[in-house]
Amino acid sequence: MGSAQARQRLLAIFGQVQAYIFQVEMLKRCDPLALLPLVGSLKLNALTIRMLRRKLGGALIEQAQHQQTPLACALTMALEYAEVEGERVLRAVDDVNLAGPEGFFRATMRLDEPCEYHVRVHLDTYGGPIDAEVQFLHDAENFLKQLNYCHLITGFEAGLDALESVARFLTRTVGSGIVVPPELCDPTHPCSVCFEELCVTANQGEAVHRRLLECTCDHITRQMAVRVANIDIARHLPHALSVASERRAAAEAALRALEARRVQGHNGKSAGTEDPTQQVASRLLESHHVFKPASRCLYAVSELKFWLASTKHGDMGQPRAIDTFTENLETLDKQEKFFHLQAATVELALFGRTLDHFDRLFADQLLGLDVIDGMLVGSCAVSPDDHIEALIKACYTHHMSAPLLQRLTDPDTSNREALKQLLGRIGVDTDDGAGELGDALDVDLDNLGGAPPVNSTPCGEDALCRTVSEERPWDKLLERATADASQRRRMYAERLSKRSIASLGRCVREQRRELEKTLRVNVYGEVLLHTYVSSYNGFCARRGFCAAVSRAGTIIDNRSSTSAFDSHQFMKAALLRHPIDQSLMPSITHKFFELINGPVFDNAGHNFAQPPNTALYYSVENVGLLPHLKEELARFMITAAKGDWSISEFQRFYCFEGVTGVTATQRLAWKYIGELILAAAVFSSVFHCGEVRLLRADRTYPDSSGAQRCVSGIYITYEASCPLVAVLSAAPHGAIGAETVVIYDSDVFSLLYAVLQQLAPGSGAN
C-alpha cells in the first residue's frame, strides 16, 4: 500500500473517530435516562475504539520513534481521548440509578475534579532546569517556540521528556474534538503565523510589534459562523424515525399551533405600533381623490409622506449600520424562550415527559452568571452572531440617545415634525388617538385650496414658504445676532456629531473582529499541532542520528583519547596562523545562522526557500529576544572573526560546566558553533581538500524502513556528551553501512585532523 493510500485510510479513520468524540461530548450533556436504551451501542463503539488502538497503536508508536506526522499525531491523541471519555460515559450510565442525573453530569464533565488543563512542564537545559505551566493554548505554543530557540542547549532526551508533558496537554485539548472550550483560547495573543503574516504585509510605517498589539489570532483556533433558525426543530422532526408516526404527527401539529400563536401575537403587536401622526396623514390622504381639488396644505402632506417613504425604501443597496442591527437582547431572550417552549412541547408529544438535559438541570447556576459569562457559555437557541449584532445595536442605541445625534442620524425626524405641525394647522389633532380620527377628517379640502381671505396669511404659509423681509432695522440687530449664534452653534454641533459617529463606527469595526473571535464557536487550527510535530521531529532526528551512526562499519572514538592531543596541537597551530578570508564572511555568517536556528522555523527548506537569517529572525522575534541580544547575535561572527576565535580547550568542545543561566549558556553555545564554522572554513582553504560540509543532526531523515539517512560530512549533534560526529564514505542516499567511517570527537581540531587523515590518498574515504 502506497503512502497516498495509507494517508487516505488514516484520514477516513480520523474522521470517524472525530465523529464519535463529538457524539460522546453531546451525550455528556443529554438526559442520562435517555441513554439507557443505547448502552449496547455505546459499548460496541467503545470496543471499536479499543480495537483501533490495539490494531493501529503499535504502528503509530513505531512511527513516532522515527518521525511524526501531524495526521498520525492527531489520530493518536484522538484515539486516546476517545477511549478515556467514551468509557467514562459508560461508567456514569451504569451508576445513574444511584447517582441520579446530577451525579451523571458531574462524573462525565468532571465538575468536582481540578482543572484538567493545568500541566506542569520541566525542561533540563545545559544551563539549569526550567519549570513552566501550560494552561492555555498560547502557553503551549509559546513554550514550543522557547524550546525551539533553546534547542542547542538542550539534549534530545530532555527535550523529548518536556514534549511528553506538552503532548498530554494537547491530548486533552486538540485531541478532544473540533470545538475549543472558550476558557482555553485568548485571541489577543498572536502566534507565529500572525507574526509572519505581518512581516509580509504593508506596515504603513508601523513597527511589527506595535501591529501585533492590535492583532487577533485566528490560526491556533479558527472561528466558525454558526446560524440557528427558529424552524430547526420543525425541519428535523420529520426525520426522527425512531419514534412512532402518530407521536411525530402530534408533535408537528403542536409546533404549528405554537407558531400560529406567535405569528398572530406578532402581527397584532405590529399593527398597533404605527405612529398616530402617520395614521392621521394616511387617512387624510385616502379621503382625497382626483375629482377633488388638492389644496396647498394637502399637497404638502403628500410631499412629506413621499419623503418619509423614500428614505425608508430608497437606499436599499447600502443600508446604514444602525439599520442592519435590528435585533436586541430582549428580542433574543424572547427567541430563546420560544425555542425552549418548542423543545418542551415536542418532548411532551414524543416521550410524554420533558428531558433533564444539562442546561435544564443546572439552569439555576447558569442564571447566576453575569451577561458576559452568559454570552461566553452561549445558547442552543441563539447563535453567537445574533449576540454580536445585539451588542453592537445596544452600543449604537446608547450612543445615539442624545437628541442632537438622533436628529443627525435620522433625517426623517424633521419631516415627521413638519407633518405633525402641518396637520395641526389644518385642524387635525394627532394626539387624540385613532378613535377620534373620523371627526378630524371632516375637513373642507375645497376651501383649503381656495384664495386666502383679505389681510390674512395662507394656511401654513409662514411655516412652509417663509420669506425674509428686506428691511433690517437696528432694533432687530440683537435678534439677528442671537439667530446667527444659534445657527453657528447648530452647525458646530452637527460637525462634532458627524465626527462622533465616524469615531464610533471606526471603533465598532475594530472591536468587532475581536468580539467575533471571542463569542463565535472556535475550532482547533493546525498551527499548534504542526509546531509540536516540528519540534518533536527535531529532537527525534537527533536521537535517530546517534543511533544510526553507532551501527557504522568503522567507528573511531576520540572523545577520551589522550593520544589525540598532538593532533589537536598540530591542527590548531596550522589554522590559527592563517587569517580568515573576508570574502567568505557572508557565507560564514549564514552558516552560523543556519546552525543555531531551531527545527520549527525551516524556511530555508521550503519550495520557495528563504535565507537562513529569515528563519532565525522569526525564531528570535517569536520568543521576544531583547534588542541588545539580537544586535549581538547579528554581529556575532564578524566580531568573532576579528579576534581569537578559538575558545575551547582540548576535548572540551561544547562543555558547559560552571555555566548557569539560559542566556549565558546560549552565548557560550554560539561561541562554540562559531569556532567550528571558522575552523572548518580555514581548514578548507589551507589544506585544499574541498569544502567541509557542516551539517545538523536534526536535519537528517529516516527512509521508509526507518533507517536514518546521513550523508557524508561533519555533524553537530548539540549533545554535550558527543557534540561532533564525522560521517565518511556513506552509501548513496546517506545510508550507514559496513563501508561507512564514523568519528566521534569532542574537540574541533583533533576531529579535523582525523578527517584529514581519512581523506588522504589511499584511505578510501570520501
From Swiss-Prot:
GO CC terms of this entry: host cell nucleus
Annotated InterPro entries: UL28/UL56
Function: Component of the molecular motor that translocates viral genomic DNA in empty capsid during DNA packaging. Forms a tripartite terminase complex together with TRM2 and TRM3 in the host cytoplasm. Once the complex reaches the host nucleus, it interacts with the capsid portal vertex. This portal forms a ring in which genomic DNA is translocated into the capsid. TRM1 carries an endonuclease activity that plays an important role for the cleavage of concatemeric viral DNA into unit length genomes.
Similarity remark: Belongs to the herpesviridae TRM1 protein family.
GO BP field: viral DNA genome packaging
GO molecular function, one term: ATP binding
UniProt name for this protein: Tripartite terminase subunit 1
Gene assigned in the entry: TRM1
Pfam families reported for this sequence: PRTP
Superkingdom in the source lineage: Viruses
Main localization category: host cell
Zinc finger (C3H1-type) stretch: 191-219
Subcellular localization(s) per the UniProt record: Host nucleus
